[in-house]
């Protein structure tokens, strides 16, 4: 029996018949008119019987009294024998009662076709599959380091909260929301983080806060706000830090984490807020070198004179805490850019007028005065991210986009 796996060549023949015939007529003519033509060794019936020639595939169509089509014959003979067999088929001149013309179109080398397909497929595999699976030494190192960091995780208390390896021995701890936050801090060498893992604060965290300096680093979303509110009620929190708006702690880069921790604010400024204003949010701090610049005509007093330009004793304030300390009890206001540069400094009583003269992005306001609902509404119209003020009175409706912090 012939096996397709042994095929070397495929003979393509073109057939034209002057009349109407069927496939069996064509097959019969092939066997009948080639019998004994090439001797016993190349007899078509014997070649099929021994599996050296495959089945004869006839494909014909009849139209207007004529029959046309192709004949395909697979062969495992060598090149010379296959060529001889193909040429013998061109001697067929009749099919049934009809005149026929048979011509060899081509002899296809199956192995060449297979090799071509193999090469094309190899190109596809090289471009597609190997692209994603390429070996990157940095990725391998990161994967190993990640596994080591996870191994360093500890479980504290009866609640088995996730914590870094230095939480017990360190004088200060950083309270985050979940396990992924602890791992991210470990990634950057911060080993004293502990996860609160929900609004139900574990007993071990309450105990740690009473013994150590506690700083919260929570997501700047509603969930982080609720967790902070719970922590402030049940634990002794010393400082509060926030992730950038719209970003969770587990997504923060090293620079963002360091900046947030460096700009932490005392928790007392949050704890002392009046109960009627519990919905006041806190500022998500950031930091950068400060540089004073003001638009022309901005920040003048009611008499039309510009307040004297401040000269700092050393370097300009670059963090929220420094700005808050600098304006405290001085009756001044500062509008800050996203990198905490001073855009404009004015009298605290002239915030409304200065606001009209500001151009560009204003990140926040630090002011030594009481903020009321009317002024807060005006600030909300400027897409200001935060307001730090001496106090907040009569706040009934706070713009959701503004976070408020009280200067202690």
From Swiss-Prot:
Span of domain Toprim: 171-250
UniProt GO molecular function: DNA-directed RNA polymerase activity; metal ion binding; poly(A) binding
Cofactor(s) for this UniProt protein: Mg(2+)
Family: Belongs to the archaeal DnaG primase family.
Cofactor binding notes: Binds two Mg(2+) per subunit.
Record keyword Endoplasmic reticulum present: no
GO biological process: DNA replication, synthesis of primer
One Gene Ontology term, aspect cellular component: exosome (RNase complex)
Bias kind Basic and acidic residues: ranges: 302-314
Name the record gives this protein: DNA primase DnaG
Biased composition annotated in UniProt, kind: Low complexity: 284-298
Residues covered by region (Disordered): 276-323
UniProt catalytic activity: ssDNA + n NTP = ssDNA/pppN(pN)n-1 hybrid + (n-1) diphosphate
Its EC number(s): 2.7.7.101
Organism: Methanoculleus marisnigri (strain ATCC 35101 / DSM 1498 / JR1)
SUPFAM superfamilies: DNA primase core
UniProt keyword list: DNA replication, DNA-directed RNA polymerase, Magnesium, Metal-binding, Nucleotidyltransferase, Primosome, Transcription, Transferase
SMART domains: TOPRIM
Record's subunit section: Forms a ternary complex with MCM helicase and DNA.
Residues that hold Mg(2+) 1 according to the record: 177, 219
Entry function: RNA polymerase that catalyzes the synthesis of short RNA molecules used as primers for DNA polymerase during DNA replication.
Residues holding Mg(2+) 2: 219, 221
């Amino acid at each position: 029996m012939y096996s397709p796996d042994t095929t070397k060549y495929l003979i393509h023949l073109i057939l034209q018949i002057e009349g109407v015939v069927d496939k069996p007529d064509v097959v019969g003519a092939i066997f009948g008119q080639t019998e004994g033509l090439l001797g016993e060794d190349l007899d078509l019936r014997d070649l099929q019987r021994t599996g050296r020639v495959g089945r004869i595939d006839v494909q014909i169509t009849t139209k207007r009294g004529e029959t046309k089509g192709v004949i395909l014959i697979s062969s495992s003979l060598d090149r010379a024998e296959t060529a001889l067999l193909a040429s013998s088929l061109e001697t067929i001149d009749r099919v049934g009662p009809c005149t026929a013309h048979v011509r060899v179109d081509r002899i296809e080398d199956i192995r060449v076709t297979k090799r071509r397909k193999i090469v094309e497929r190899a190109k596809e595999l090289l471009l597609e599959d190997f692209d994603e699976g390429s070996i990157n030494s940095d990725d391998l190192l990161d994967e190993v380091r990640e596994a080591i960091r996870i191994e360093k995780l500890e479980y504290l208390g009866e609640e088995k909260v996730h914590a870094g390896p230095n939480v017990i021995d360190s004088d200060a701890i950083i309270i985050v929301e979940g396990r992924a936050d602890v791992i991210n801090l470990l990634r950057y060498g911060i080993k004293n983080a502990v996860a609160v893992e929900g609004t139900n604060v574990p007993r071990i965290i309450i105990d740690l806060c009473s013994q150590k300096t506690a700083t919260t680093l929570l997501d700047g979303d509603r969930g982080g706000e609720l967790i902070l509110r719970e922590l402030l009620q049940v634990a002794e929190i010393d400082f509060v830090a926030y992730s950038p708006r719209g970003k969770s702690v587990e997504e923060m880069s090293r620079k963002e984490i360091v900046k947030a921790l460096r700009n932490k604010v005392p928790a007392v400024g949050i704890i002392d807020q009046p109960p009627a204003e519990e919905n006041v949010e806190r500022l998500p701090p950031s930091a950068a070198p400060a540089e004073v610049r003001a638009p022309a005509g901005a920040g003048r007093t009611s008499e039309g004179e510009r307040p004297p330009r401040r000269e700092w004793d050393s370097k300009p304030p670059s963090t929220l805490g420094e700005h808050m300390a600098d304006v405290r009890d001085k009756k001044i206001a500062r509008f800050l850019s996203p990198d905490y540069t001073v855009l404009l400094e004015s009298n605290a009583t002239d915030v409304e007028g200065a606001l009209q003269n500001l151009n560009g992005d204003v990140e926040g306001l630090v002011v030594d005065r009481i903020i009321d609902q009317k002024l807060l509404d005006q600030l909300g119209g400027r897409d200001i991210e935060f307001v730090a003020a001496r106090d907040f009175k009569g706040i009934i409706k706070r713009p959701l986009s503004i976070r408020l912090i009280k200067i202690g």
